């Protein structure tokens, strides 16, 4: 298992992207809309990991609810796993509360699933199937 990316919820990609581009000394490596999660994301490769900026595309998206509750900032930590479906079964059997019981498509068309913060010390954890 390794760190895949850190997700940061922002009110506006147009406002946040230039700040991160200046800080990182590079443009975003990718930008896309993830319809299922109702977000627009900009991804920056940083060493062996990534920073993902998330902007809600709908007021009822998880990112919009997160910003309304906690403001902009850390949204989730994503970890790469080899067998996502197997890891979800293992964690559920161990009593970890899952948001997603089955993998779904996320940014970059990767298979992802989220663990509930109630089981992970208050941090939203995303598991990403390692390619």
Regions found by a protein language model. Give the residues of each.
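Intrinsic, low-complexity N-terminal interaction/targeting segments
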Residues: 34, 53-65, 98, 103-114
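Short, charged/polar surface micro-motifs in flexible loops or helix N-caps
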Residues: 47-51, 58-60, 84
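Long, hydrophobic N-terminal alpha-helical segment
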Residues: 1-37, 61
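Vicinal oxygen chelate
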Residues: 3-11, 42-45, 64-131
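Hydrophobic side chains in well-ordered alpha-helices
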Residues: 16-19, 87-91
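Short, structured motif recognition centered on aromatic/hydrophobic residues
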Residues: 3, 20, 44, 51-54, ...
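C-terminal "cap" of GNAT-fold acetyltransferases
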Residues: 34-50
